[in-house]
Design a protein with these regions (language model features):
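Catalytic core of pol beta-like nucleotidyltransferases
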Residues: 4-50, 56-102, 106-117, 126-284
């Protein structure tokens, strides 16, 4: 007979697996713990699974009879690893940039899965006054560098504009990121969003992914760093890009300002939250 505590943990696990089913993902016990919205431990998860008729664990992966198994997950995981390796050189250039104080993998690759046509999404945190020049560098590398074609710098933020809205979606996305560089930028991100621990009390920042070398910058990057001229270019690039992006934007999730370039044009958050509610209602 299950205890009230076991029942609570089972319900919390059900919620996590409903979430992961939206992405075709299967989580190990540690990932389930990271995503639980109640305080728990690996032992409490294992005990709850043992007490539940619909939960099981195989090779440390937690399954539920309420959701289909993704038979292609190994291939998706191999793609994530492959795409990251293909992008390592261009990421190492960004990592070496002094104006970037935080760099992290986000999205599917950070979750450990990707599609054949998937990108490598990254979050870039810059020193104040550098968002649009750094974005220009990242976009240039994604288009012109031999290893940059998968790079998708869809979020470039100034380190003085790191507060996010308080939602389950945002909390999970934030705790899913894999840091590549943290010269106080990623640390500030978590400090500014301390509410994440209220939603995900067991979550810890993922360890950094090491990158050892870096390549050359385009010649014009030296011009961007000239003090007065660089500031003029930053203002000019910000004005023209913000105007251009706002004119073409079709998503209420996208945000463009002098200190934020959040190009979430596919309304991913809105769609996932709607699907999430439908899945939750179906299993209750």
């Amino acid at each position: 007979m299950s205890s009230e505590s076991d029942t609570t943990i089972v319900e919390a696990i059900d919620e996590v697996l409903a979430w992961s089913s939206l992405f075709g993902d299967h989580m190990d016990a540690e990932s389930v713990l990271r995503n639980l919205q109640v305080k728990g431990s690996i032992n409490s998860i294992l005990q709850a699974i043992e007490s539940s008729p619909h939960l099981s664990i195989e090779n440390d992966v937690v399954y539920s009879d309420k959701h289909d198994r993704n038979l292609n997950i190994k291939y998706s995981q191999e793609l994530a690893s492959k795409h990251f390796k293909e992008t390592m050189e261009v990421l190492s250039i960004l990592k070496s940039c002094e104006q970037i104080t935080g760099l992290a993998l986000t999205g599917s690759v950070a979750a450990g899965m990707n599609k054949d046509d998937g990108d490598v999404d990254v979050m870039i945190i810059t020193k104040p006054g550098w968002v649009w020049r750094v974005r220009a560098l990242a976009i240039y590398l994604s288009h012109e560098h031999p290893t940059g074609q998968l790079l998708c710098p869809n979020m470039v933020l100034s380190e003085d504009s790191l507060r996010f809205e308080k939602t389950v979606y945002t909390a999970r996305e934030m705790m899913q990121i894999i840091p590549i560089k943290d010269s106080k930028g990623i640390t500030k991100l978590y400090d500014e969003n301390g509410w994440v621990k209220e939603i995900l009390p067991n979550a810890q920042k993922k360890p950094s992914r090491p990158l050892s070398k870096h390549g050359d910058y385009p010649w014009w990057w030296r011009v961007m760093k000239i003090p007065l001229l660089g500031q003029i270019i930053e203002s000019w690039e910000a004005r023209r890009r913000i105007k251009q992006l706002k004119l073409t934007s079709t998503s209420n999730e996208a945000l463009y300002s002098k200190s934020i370039c959040r190009g979430h044009e596919n309304s991913h958050k809105t769609r996932i939250e709607a699907e999430y509610q439908n899945v939750l209602e179906a299993i209750l």
